Amino acid sequence: MTQRLSSLWLSLLISIMGTAHANEHQNAERIDFSKPLPVLDSLKQVQEKQFTLPKFERFTTDGGIPVIFTQLDGLPMVDISVDFQAGSAFDRQVRTDALGVANMTANLLTKGAGELDEEAFLLAKDRLGIHLNAGATKDTLGISLRSLNQNKTLYDALSLLQKMLSQPKFDASTLEREKSELISSLKQHEQNPSYLAARAYQQALYQDHPYATLTTGDIQTVKTLSVNDIRNFRDKFLIAQNAVITITGNLSQAEAKNIANQIGASLPSGQKAPMLPSPTKATAKHIHVPHDSTQTSIIMGHLAPKVARTQADFLQKTHFSLANTALAGGSFNARLMDEIREKRGYTYGIYGRNVAMNVAGHYQISFSTNASQAKDAIKATRAVIDDAITNGILSDELNLVANQHTYQHPMSFASNASIHALATTMNIHGLPDIYANGEIDRIKQASLDDVNQALRQTIRPDDFIIVTVGQDKPDLSDVLKTNLNNQ
């Protein structure tokens, strides 16, 4: 399937972005949407060229593990990901206060395996010239390998990956060192108002749900982590029943199937991780975290939909993405940037985004401002959002962001790494091909009513949880229209 891509438009975007960056401390000229947009008219005259979407091949290993393989012959490179549907949200299923165990397990997976201690393992990676990493999110723990596809190199790289999966070292002295380093890092984070705001926001938003805690855990819980905790997490969750495998690069399908089967054979069997419960909606409130800073860091938002998995969900996601780009996308033509930064000078940047997760995501707007202006900045932000919801975004705003999204989407297919990342996301969440190859059509077919309806359905200002971190607690009793609980 092919879609149209304008190279000139990409050049224009790069030029505009570069100019904006170079002049970020100067007044940026906002587009007047009450007048015709010459740049949009000129684009109609630009000759467009074709690009080809990659073909995602789906199969399962002999043991039933889902695989997405994308054959790309341009580079002698192979990317492989093994992702497990069990991240830090499952920490408490190992031990009630074992918060951070998924993150630490991922950390230790690259610190020795089989007969290789940490130093030998790192030397083997360096000798092969490969990237072999592991990391955890709230929903998943993932391992990624990038290697040349030369037979000897790829064979040895796969052998190292299989040792990670089947014979992780989990050395006690290494664990103590990594705990010490993480605790030092967490102590530094305690001085970061953005970190404090994110932690307080997630705790208030998700309450007693497993999503309420940060993936790293906290200082006290990290101190308690033991090798037994790490092994228990690995044995319970890093199993074939929780796994998906994604392979991208210069291989035949037969080679990809062979590799997937080798990886699958390295995984123990067990009981598939249960689906997490849905979180309970939190009451709108203002939470202030005292912090010695002249700036106040602010997050405001609420629960939002989980990962989109159906065509109807994809439409809603696209429509809201367009609306949010116009309202809170972070560019100088986004309404919040224009009003809160350019006109009022409250902040250097303000940005809103949807964070989708397996059972419930969240929408949040983040910025910082001078402590004395915090109340006014929050009040002005709320006013801009209320106006967008009441009156909608304008047709010329939609045209601008629709063109932006149309010409940005092919960047998802611009490199092996970006294609692999997209395929990995699709594999983790069980998304059909239409998720990727239908986006341009969804953008082009989006009407102004569609986009404004998605905006109204997604952003609910009366449900906002507002977190402020700074010296002085702003009085927000008159900001929200509903009863506001101050803490």
Show where each model-derived region lies.
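His/Glu-rich zincin catalytic helix
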Residues: 23-123, 144, 231-339, 465-487
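M16 family metallopeptidases and their MPP-like homologs
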Residues: 70, 75-107, 118-165, 183, ...
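Short, polar/flexible loop-turn hinges at active-site or ligand-entry regions and domain interfaces
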Residues: 112-115, 165-173
